[in-house]
From Swiss-Prot:
Taxonomy of the source species: Eukaryota, Metazoa, Chordata, Craniata, Vertebrata
Functional description taken from the UniProt entry: Putative taste receptor which may play a role in the perception of bitterness.
Name of the protein described by the UniProt record: Taste receptor type 2 member 109
Gene: Tas2r109
Swiss-Prot/TrEMBL keywords: G-protein coupled receptor, Glycoprotein, Membrane, Receptor, Sensory transduction, Taste, Transducer, Transmembrane, Transmembrane helix
Membrane topology: Multi-pass membrane protein
Family to which this protein belongs: Belongs to the G-protein coupled receptor T2R family.
Length: 320
């Protein structure tokens, strides 16, 4: 039994980095494709709509996030001593926090945009926000920047305090380890609180979208039987995007909460790799949900797949 468990452990230790590497590459390709299509459309039309601006900025932030994670993985595998250096950890943490914060908040801006553009309510407050959707998105983005600054400031202050107190301690190794773990848990708790804000903002929009779809569907049933109008289709597409965002976001937050509650697991390399795979799943796979939910991106992806399918036949024809 012990031999079997050791074999499973050895296999997992070799397989998990490969899974993470493939996941990050898939995410970089998906987000890169999304940014490229929108940039080409911008060059062609000389203008870019608000939703395309959000999608392009979101894709760019996620490309940066995934590249930071990929470089961190490569450095850890190739030079573990460099990866464990305090300065390297601090720089990598700050870069990850910035890119991850922007990725989550831009996805939240996209959720709010879909809600204001697609939902139908007669409330004067909703109509006021709907007619000023660009200002609403701008305000949300500015609030996210303030929270990012606050997050970075508080986390770096907390780290500096922990380091200063750590150097004053002159007692047993076990106490130092527990003290250091407590400091890192405090930093993690602060990070979870800051990252919970966009989730709290996105969840009501999801519920209101469902309610808007339900009321719209009831009205349509009274007039048209067995048909789905454009508004209903738009509601379903928006809901698919928001559901995917919230589902992946929940998994992301739950993995961070698991780290907080069971911090002793952070000593285990396999658990750290598993957490990185969970973190990478959010920016990697959500991009493909966005591609499938956008007609222009979906058509562009189908064109690329068709070209890749026909390319070998074209090369064979040239060889003949």
């Amino acid at each position: 039994m012990e031999h079997f468990l050791k074999s499973i452990f050895d296999i997992s230790k070799n397989v998990l980095p490969i899974i993470l590497f493939i996941e990050l590459i898939i995410g970089i390709i998906g987000n890169g494709f999304m940014a490229l299509v929108h940039c080409m459309d911008w060059v062609k039309r000389k203008k870019m709509s608000l939703v395309n601006q959000i999608l392009t900025t979101l894709a760019t932030s996620r490309i940066c996030l995934l590249w930071f994670m990929l470089l961190g993985l490569l450095i850890t595998l190739l030079d573990p001593d460099l990866a464990s250096a305090r300065m390297m950890i601090q720089v990598a943490s700050n870069l990850w926090i910035i890119a991850n914060h922007m990725s989550i908040w831009l996805a939240t801006c996209l959720t709010v945009f879909y809600f204001l553009k697609i939902a139908n309510f007669s409330s004067s407050l909703f109509l006021y926000l709907k007619w000023r959707v660009e200002k609403v998105i701008s305000v949300i983005f500015l609030v996210s920047l303030v929270l990012l600054f606050l997050n970075m400031l508080l986390m770096n202050l907390e780290n500096d305090m922990c380091i200063a107190e750590y150097h004053q301690i002159n007692i047993s190794y076990s106490f130092i380890y527990h003290y250091r773990a407590d400091c890192e848990r405090r930093v993690l708790r602060l990070h979870i609180i800051i990252l919970s804000v966009p989730f709290v903002l996105s969840l009501p929009t999801f519920l209101l979208l469902i309610f808007s779809l339900w009321t719209h569907h009831k009205k349509m049933q009274q007039h048209v039987q067995g048909r789905r109008d454009a508004s209903t289709t738009a509601h379903f597409k928006a809901l698919q995007t928001v559901i995917a965002f919230l589902l992946l976001y929940c998994i992301f937050i739950l993995s961070m909460l698991l780290q907080f509650w069971k911090y002793e697991l952070m000593k285990k390399p396999l658990f750290i790799l598993f957490c990185h795979i969970v973190y990478g799943a959010f920016p990697s796979f959500h991009s493909y949900v966005l591609i499938l939910g956008d007609m222009k991106l979906r058509q562009a992806s189908l064109s690329v797949l068709l070209w890749l399918k026909c390319r070998p036949n074209y090369i064979e024809t040239l060889d003949l």
